[in-house]
């Protein structure tokens, strides 16, 4: 099995705009790159991941990721799901039979949690890691890589579940702290500042 991870990152000039009331543009840029570094470090340490593709329309992000061992893929347009489809196609071209999608704003993600998500995959199907509110999807493992279409954004967890059901695909759901906690709002920043990173939980459920 060949598992390739795809990490999408938008332009630094527009990233984390919901934090604009709390952070200046330079501070948001620093935060985005710091979170990305942590995610790439975890992916590089994961035993189940063979390669990492970083998709972005921002040349600075691509250069930053390439220095950390990622395959840098320029996204001609904009849009999270457009970038993920581009990354998926590149992963297929490189021989992937399993696609791992991981968002770039997970400050507590660990290599063990990444491995657990891939290990949760059935022979053919999907494994989802929702955010802590069960609204969004922070990571997804797909076998084959085009098992479902990426539908990330607000409410994506329900959309991905619905796709799996409509296609008759087995679905597993993994809820662990490092995959569930993302940085979107000032409240998230406050929680991050008030808590030290913790190790992976073993909680797992499947449907």
UniProtKB/Swiss-Prot annotation:
Q: Which Pfam families match?
A: CofC (PF01983)
Q: Which species?
A: Sphaerobacter thermophilus (strain ATCC 49802 / DSM 20745 / KCCM 41009 / NCIMB 13125 / S 6022)
Q: Which family does this protein fall into?
A: Belongs to the CofC family.
Known PANTHER family for this protein? 2-PHOSPHO-L-LACTATE GUANYLYLTRANSFERASE
Record InterPro entries: CofC (IPR002835), Nucleotide-diphossugar_trans (IPR029044)
This entry's Enzyme Commission designation comes to: 2.7.7.105
* GO MF entries: GTP binding; phospholactate guanylyltransferase activity
The protein here is known as: Phosphoenolpyruvate guanylyltransferase
Task of the protein: Guanylyltransferase that catalyzes the activation of phosphoenolpyruvate (PEP) as enolpyruvoyl-2-diphospho-5'-guanosine, via the condensation of PEP with GTP. It is involved in the biosynthesis of coenzyme F420, a hydride carrier cofactor.
């Amino acid at each position: 099995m060949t598992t390739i991870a795809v990490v999408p990152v938008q332009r630094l000039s527009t990233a984390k705009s919901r934090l604009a009331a709390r952070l200046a543009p330079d501070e948001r840029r620093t935060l985005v790159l710091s979170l990305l570094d942590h995610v790439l470090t975890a992916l590089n340490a994961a035993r189940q991941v063979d390669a990492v593709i970083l998709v972005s329309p921002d040349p600075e992000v691509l250069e930053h990721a390439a220095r950390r061992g990622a395959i840098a893929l320029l996204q001609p347009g904009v849009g999270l799901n457009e970038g993920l489809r581009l990354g998926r196609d590149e992963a297929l071209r490189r021989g992937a039979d399993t696609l791992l999608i991981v968002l770039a704003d997970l400050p507590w993600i660990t290599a063990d949690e990444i491995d657990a998500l891939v290990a949760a995959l059935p022979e053919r199907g999907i494994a989802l890691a929702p955010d802590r509110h069960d609204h969004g999807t922070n990571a997804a493992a797909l076998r084959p890589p085009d098992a479902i279409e990426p539908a990330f954004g607000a409410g994506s967890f329900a959309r991905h579940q619905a796709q799996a059901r409509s296609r008759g695909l087995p679905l597993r759901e993994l809820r662990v702290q490092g995959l569930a906690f993302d940085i979107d709002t000032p409240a998230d920043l406050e929680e991050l500042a008030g808590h030290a990173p913790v190790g992976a939980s073993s909680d797992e459920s499947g449907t």
